[in-house]
């Protein structure tokens, strides 16, 4: 099947989806309606571009006909030639765009994510920066219309974050935030620095797709579940009922502790969401490490300790080291305006994949 046949098949399916989504039987089946809605949304950009491309092809045909029919009318012929030139340039642009839109999609792109942020090298300052990153992602999620839920958090005594685990839910969350995994470095003068010297600290970010139970089954025999009394806030319930849950995946020794909720069942459900994502991610990383050539052709899928981005406060500068992107917009980026960074990373990744296909 050539590219044009692929595009026509996508458009045909899109039109079929439109009819299905108007069918009362489908509308009454919530799960099917949601699945078909997601499928329609995932192909909308491709179909829109393909329809515009067909208009451009028609413009080329019309311009060529106009040149033939000019009958010595120099002005008309000149105008038609310019229209033909413009249309051919548009055709090339759309062909490149459509090739990218037809690239195989990451099966996780439409999923919600588990987001983990930790203060790393730099003590209190690293943990304060981890708090800044948490706020940045919260504000970005709000701008995208996503739901942001902090599931577990450990704070230090100066307003920083030792570790935070959050669930981010909404449309195409993973597709936009999957490139955030790695080490984020900050260069700034800490509030505790009396000499005005710039310090360098690091926080780490891990983004994992949410894995449903039906997608990844963990053998209950591989889990150890401990129930204990929660500590900290929670009122009288803390002392009377053991509601905190610790789950250990024995083969990998991956642990999750959850005590934010007031009931044992809710803590257990949240802990299982996190451990399922972590275990699936653990084995996915092993599989990916065995595909070195493929990993090197993409971004954001290498060493989790790799420094991916630097935030330089004195110069109001953010640099993404993977793609050489530098923006003098640190203040707006930390305020949650991440679109320019995310769009650049997505475009780079798509371009790299396209080059791989063309080899």
From Swiss-Prot:
* Entry similarity comment: Belongs to the prokaryotic/mitochondrial release factor family.
Q: Where is it localised?
A: Cytoplasm
Q: Which domain of life is it from?
A: Bacteria
The UniProt function text for this chain reads: Peptide chain release factor 1 directs the termination of translation in response to the peptide chain termination codons UAG and UAA.
GO MF terms, alphabetically ordered: translation release factor activity, codon specific
Q: Where mainly found?
A: cytoplasm
Q: Which residues form a coiled coil?
A: none
State the encoding gene: prfA
In the record, N5-methylglutamine modifications are located at 236
Question: Which Pfam families does UniProt cross-reference here?
Answer: PCRF, RF-1
Record field: compositional bias (Basic and acidic residues)? 293-307
Cite the residue spans of the region called Disordered: 288-307
Which named protein is this? Peptide chain release factor 1
PROSITE patterns per the record? RF_PROK_I (PS00745)
**Keywords, comma-separated and alphabetical:** Cytoplasm, Methylation, Protein biosynthesis
One Gene Ontology cellular component term attached to this UniProt record is:
cytoplasm
């Amino acid at each position: 099947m050539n590219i044009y046949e692929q595009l026509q098949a996508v458009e045909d399916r899109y039109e079929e989806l439109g009819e299905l989504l108007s069918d009362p039987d489908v509308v009454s089946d919530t799960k099917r309606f949601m699945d078909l809605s997601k499928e329609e949304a995932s192909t909308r950009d491709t179909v829109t571009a393909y329809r515009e491309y067909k208009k451009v092809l028609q413009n080329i045909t019309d311009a060529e006909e106009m040149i033939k029919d000019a009958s010595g009318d120099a002005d008309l012929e000149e105008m038609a030639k310019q229209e033909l030139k413009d249309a051919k340039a548009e055709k090339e642009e759309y062909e490149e765009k459509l090739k990218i839109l037809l690239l195989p999609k990451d099966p996780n792109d439409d999923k919600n994510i588990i987001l983990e942020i930790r203060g790393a090298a730099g003590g209190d300052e690293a943990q304060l920066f981890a708090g800044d990153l948490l706020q940045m992602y919260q504000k970005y999620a709000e701008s995208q219309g996503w739901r942001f839920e902090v599931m577990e958090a450990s704070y230090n005594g100066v307003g920083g974050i030792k570790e935070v685990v959050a669930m981010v839910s909404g449309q195409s969350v993973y597709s936009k935030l999957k490139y955030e995994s790695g080490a984020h470095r900050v260069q700034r003068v800490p509030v505790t620095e009396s000499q005005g010297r710039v310090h360098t600290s690091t926080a780490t970010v891990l983004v994992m797709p949410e894995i449903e139970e039906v997608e990844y089954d963990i053998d209950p025999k591989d889990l150890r579940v401990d129930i204990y009394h929660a500590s900290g806030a929670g009122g009288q319930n803390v002392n009377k009922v053991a509601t905190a849950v610790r789950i250990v995946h024995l083969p990998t020794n991956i642990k999750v502790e959850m005590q934010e909720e007031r009931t044992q069942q809710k803590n257990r459900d949240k802990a299982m969401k996190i451990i399922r994502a972590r275990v699936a991610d653990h084995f996915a990383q092993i599989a990916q490490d065995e595909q070195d050539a493929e990993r090197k052709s993409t971004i954001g899928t290498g060493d989790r300790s790799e420094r991916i981005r630097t935030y330089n406060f004195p110069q109001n500068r953010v640099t993404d080291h993977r793609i050489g992107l530098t923006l003098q917009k640190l203040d707006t980026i930390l305020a949650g305006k991440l679109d320019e960074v995310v769009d650049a990373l997505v475009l780079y990744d798509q371009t790299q994949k396209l080059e791989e296909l063309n080899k």
